[in-house]
């Protein structure tokens, strides 16, 4: 018989068939008891058979991916750790300083869809190796730029986006193809621990290397060497697992990639993906603003309080605030990601909408604490640090949960594309423009006041208050996600199991009896 002769006589219904009810056995992690001990969810032995990798090897792959994720964020925030020195070296203001991060994020955002498309269709391991090698080379080159070539620093920071785009769109999909259910959530939480820890290490390494070397340029020469090690580990340790195999039944048809436009149309019709991406955009806006401007704001606060001397031309700027903020970022990130995943995991037992609700609570809860941190900065730097700690902990609850939402509402053959467009959306409306926007508002306010250290502090203080408002908007987007999350997850599960096949726009349909009722199916599915 030909391949067409062995196809099922009748195919499962799509839009006219409601399919199995939520919680139906045979759908992994189906709603009603998400991530339950479903018999269709493969056990450890089943995972090893499907992926061809032992549990130890899979865990080692995640460890390598975590190391690279940590390295990416460490490099990104090394610049923020020495920002006052960069401003002094190139003789630039707050607006131009904000461009450093904006140019990088813009490049990252433009390249993400390219690597998302490639990641759904080609070998993900080699894509990451090439991107990280290029990123390491460009980062090293950016440390040798003379003071009269600020535009060249912007160019090199933009090119760094190649490496980050090649990695960030692909790495989570590898984890999704190695683990399922609670195991996947735990591995994603470990993976996303690297974001706050890497960010904090960037502040710490940047400030301490500058102090030891006596030159901020050396801060940019640490991560390229670590990047070479990352490429070696990727090449030797990481293996490509089959896409989506751990989520299919043994008798389910294989998932084949659809056209790029079909992928985009499907994602645009997925409200959980769109709304959770908008909520994550608010997280990116706030974290991007704080990442670049919090150390500078804390330094200005301490200058106004008389606790530290101002940063004058020819002098090295104080790095203590970068060090403290880096430690806070590490601690709050680990605490927030862990709390978010654990709270969500426990609430899922009784509430299938737990994931977006926990994200909403984190964002809505962080907004007042960030506002209080800014409002108290002129009176007590200790109170400011306490409120920043609480606000960043609540904000960090989102990282792993948002990634998990994307992976279970989007089918495997579209996940890299979905990751890419979530990156584009979150950066386009989030941290691509927020550092520059905050810096520009600060510069505009300073022009209306007499020049002084107090006016510099107040201008940045008022501009950063925008973050609290944006955080509240993000919380509202996650509340909207909670409305659609059950139906969108169930649709993705049906599709992976082959119960909701794709049909072309010209594929005529007929009504045939199935399971005692009329069901609309493609004509091709009843032809022998």
Curated annotation (Swiss-Prot):
Which molecular function term from Gene Ontology is one that the record holds? Answer: transmembrane transporter activity
Q: Which GO terms describe its cellular component?
A: lysosomal membrane; membrane
Q: Where is this region: Disordered?
A: 1-44
Q: Which UniProt keywords apply?
A: Lipid transport, Lysosome, Membrane, Phosphoprotein, Transmembrane, Transmembrane helix, Transport
Membrane topology qualifier: Multi-pass membrane protein
Q: Does the keyword field hold Lipoprotein?
A: no
Any one of the GO BP annotations: lysophospholipid transport
Tell me the protein family, please.
Answer: Belongs to the major facilitator superfamily. Spinster (TC 2.A.1.49) family.
Q: What is this protein called?
A: Protein spinster homolog 1
């Amino acid at each position: 018989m030909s391949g067409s002769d062995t196809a099922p006589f009748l195919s499962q219904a799509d839009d006219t068939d409601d399919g199995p009810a939520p919680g139906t056995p045979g759908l992994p992690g189906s709603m009603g008891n998400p991530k339950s001990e479903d018999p269709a969810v493969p056990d450890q032995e089943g995972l090893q058979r499907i992926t061809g990798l032992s549990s130890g090897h899979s865990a080692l792959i995640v460890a390598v991916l975590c190391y690279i994720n940590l390295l990416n964020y460490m490099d990104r925030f090394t610049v923020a750790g020495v920002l006052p020195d960069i401003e002094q070296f190139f003789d630039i203001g707050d607006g131009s300083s904000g461009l450093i991060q904006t140019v990088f994020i813009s490049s990252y955002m433009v390249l993400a869809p390219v690597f998302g498309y490639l990641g759904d269709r080609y070998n993900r391991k080699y894509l990451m190796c090439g991107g990280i090698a290029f990123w390491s080379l460009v980062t090293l080159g950016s440390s040798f730029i003379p003071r009269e070539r600020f535009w060249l620093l912007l160019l090199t920071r933009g090119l760094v986006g190649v490496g980050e785009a090649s990695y960030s769109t692909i790495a989570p999909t590898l984890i999704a193809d190695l683990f399922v259910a609670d195991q996947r959530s735990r591995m994603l939480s470990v993976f996303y621990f690297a974001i706050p820890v890497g960010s904090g290490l960037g502040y710490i390494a940047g400030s301490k290397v500058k102090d030891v070397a006596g030159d901020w340029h050396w801060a940019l020469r640490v991560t390229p060497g670590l990047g070479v090690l990352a490429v070696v580990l990727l090449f030797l340790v990481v293996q490509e697992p089959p896409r989506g195999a751990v989520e299919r039944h043994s008798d389910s048809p294989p998932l084949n990639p659809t056209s790029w436009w079909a992928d985009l149309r499907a994602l645009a019709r997925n409200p959980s993906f769109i709304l959770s991406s908008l909520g994550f955009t608010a997280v990116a806006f706030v974290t991007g603003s704080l990442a670049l401007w919090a150390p500078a704001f804390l330094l200005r606060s301490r200058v106004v309080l008389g606790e530290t001397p101002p940063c004058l031309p020819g002098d090295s700027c104080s790095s203590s605030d970068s060090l403290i903020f880096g430690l806070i970022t590490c601690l709050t990130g680990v605490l927030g990601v862990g709390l978010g995943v654990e709270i969500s995991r426990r609430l899922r037992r009784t509430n299938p909408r737990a994931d977006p609700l926990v994200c909403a609570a984190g964002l809505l809860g962080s907004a007042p604490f960030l506002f209080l941190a800014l409002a108290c900065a002129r009176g007590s730097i200790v109170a400011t640090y306490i409120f920043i700690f609480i606000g960043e902990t609540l904000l960090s609850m989102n990282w792993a949960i948002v990634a998990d939402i994307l992976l279970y509402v989007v089918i495997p053959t579209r996940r890299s594309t979905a990751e890419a467009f979530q990156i584009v959306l979150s950066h386009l409306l989030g941290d691509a423009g927020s550092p520059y926007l905050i810096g520009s508002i600060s510069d505009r306010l300073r022009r209306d006041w007499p020049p002084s250290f107090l006016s510099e502090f107040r201008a940045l203080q008022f501009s950063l208050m925008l973050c609290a408002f944006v955080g509240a908007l993000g919380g509202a987007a996650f509340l909207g996600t909670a409305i659609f999350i059950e139906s969108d997850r169930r649709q993705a599960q049906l599709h992976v199991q082959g119960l909701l096949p794709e049909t072309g726009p010209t594929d005529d349909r007929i009504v045939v009896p199935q399971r005692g009722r009329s069901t609309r199916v493609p004509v091709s599915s009843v032809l022998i």
